[in-house]
Amino acid sequence: MNILRSVVSRGRKGLKQEKVNRSFAYLDMVYITSKVIAMSTPAAGIHKLYRNDELDVFKYLTTQLKDNWILLNLCAEETVYHLELFKPNVINYGFQDHNPPPLLFLWAIVMNMDALFQTQPLLTLVVHCKAGKGRTGTVICSYLVAFGGLTAKQSLELYTEKRMVRGHGLTISSQIRYVYYIEILKQFPNYLKAVEFNTGTTFFKSFKCLNIKKNSSLILSLHAFSKGRNINPVALWKSSDISSHNVSIKEGKRIWGIQCNLETSEKDLLLRVERKGQFYFPSSVQCWFHTHFQPMLVEYTNGINFQQGINSFLQGQQSISFSWSEMDNSRRSDPFFEQLTIVYENVF
């Protein structure tokens, strides 16, 4: 059983790297800081054959940390362990696997983490999703940026060092992007209220893809986070086949353009790009972005001080671009475009 768990958790560090009782050595959990633990999900039934046995997790927490622990469950999907076993020491902050949470929700999570530490100085927070990697890392890195004195880059490096035997801790571009959004919120906290109370809309005007592959058809769609129990993103708009789109050639590169004409009050949006064609297997890439914070992030990473220019991001026309490598799932197929540019206008 422990061999199977080791195979499933390969690449990630666990308590076997720590000096612990042998009975806990195969738990897939690790201390990122002395007060924050990253962990894959506890499990019952057949799932405990390859995940952390919920009874072993509970025994570790209660014997090593007494009652000074709280479990943060980030799984939006149905849990595979008995929540009742850990109550009242469990808080649910579920969001979809392989995705970031909405930005303001992410900020609320890290704010509550800090509040818990302020009221319970001996507390250890145990953060888990399914594998204890992507969603867990998004929240922990965001907390370290907001309250741990680290930059986004430093938090990502620390998480990789502490959590991984090989590879990177966070690999999904959208999750990494949202950690950087938190750094902007930390550096410029006055922006938070402006974004929270912004009731304006965003008018999406056009998309442009640079250097798309020949004989391929692109279909674009925009989605928003679901506000109900369904964890799947809600579709807002979808393009038609490439035959109705504008294709031009510039400097030997095919440029594909399309008008959008979508108005929405959503600020966190998912852009999905699907490729279809006679000579290609269907494939898709996507990215989450925030309509206010993405243009901020571009200027912030370029070293531009925009502290006095918040209104330019809350309203007015924006043009943002994502390279192929900045798209989620981009490593799973050969690039079918080089860069995608979105033009939209924020309106109060």
Swiss-Prot record:
**Alphabetic keyword roster:** Cytoplasmic vesicle, Hydrolase, Protein phosphatase
What is the E.C. number?
3.1.3.67
Q: So what does this thing catalyse?
A: a 1,2-diacyl-sn-glycero-3-phospho-(1D-myo-inositol-3,4,5-trisphosphate) + H2O = a 1,2-diacyl-sn-glycero-3-phospho-(1D-myo-inositol-4,5-bisphosphate) + phosphate; 1,2-dioctanoyl-sn-glycero-3-phospho-(1D-myo-inositol-3,4,5-trisphosphate) + H2O = 1,2-dioctanoyl-sn-glycero-3-phospho-(1D-myo-inositol-4,5-bisphosphate) + phosphate; 1,2-dihexadecanoyl-sn-glycero-3-phospho-(1D-myo-inositol-3,4,5-trisphosphate) + H2O = 1,2-dihexadecanoyl-sn-glycero-3-phospho-(1D-myo-inositol-4,5-bisphosphate) + phosphate
Q: Where is the active site?
A: C129
Q: Which Gene3D superfamilies match?
A: Protein tyrosine phosphatase superfamily (3.90.190.10)
Superkingdom, taxonomy of origin: Eukaryota
One biological process term in Gene Ontology: phosphatidylinositol phosphate biosynthetic process
Domain Phosphatase tensin-type as annotated: residue spans: 18-189
Q: Where in the cell is it found?
A: Cytoplasmic vesicle
Gene Ontology cellular component?
cell division site; cytosol; late endosome
One Pfam family name is PTP-SAK
Q: What is its main location?
A: cytoplasm
Q: Name one GO molecular function term.
A: phosphoprotein phosphatase activity
Function (record text): Acts as a phosphoinositide 3-phosphatase and regulates PtdIns(3,4,5)P3 levels.
Q: What is this protein called?
A: Phosphatidylinositol 3,4,5-trisphosphate 3-phosphatase ptn1
Task: Give the organism, scientific name.
Answer: Schizosaccharomyces pombe (strain 972 / ATCC 24843) (Fission yeast)
Give the classification, highest ranks.
Eukaryota, Fungi, Dikarya, Ascomycota, Taphrinomycotina
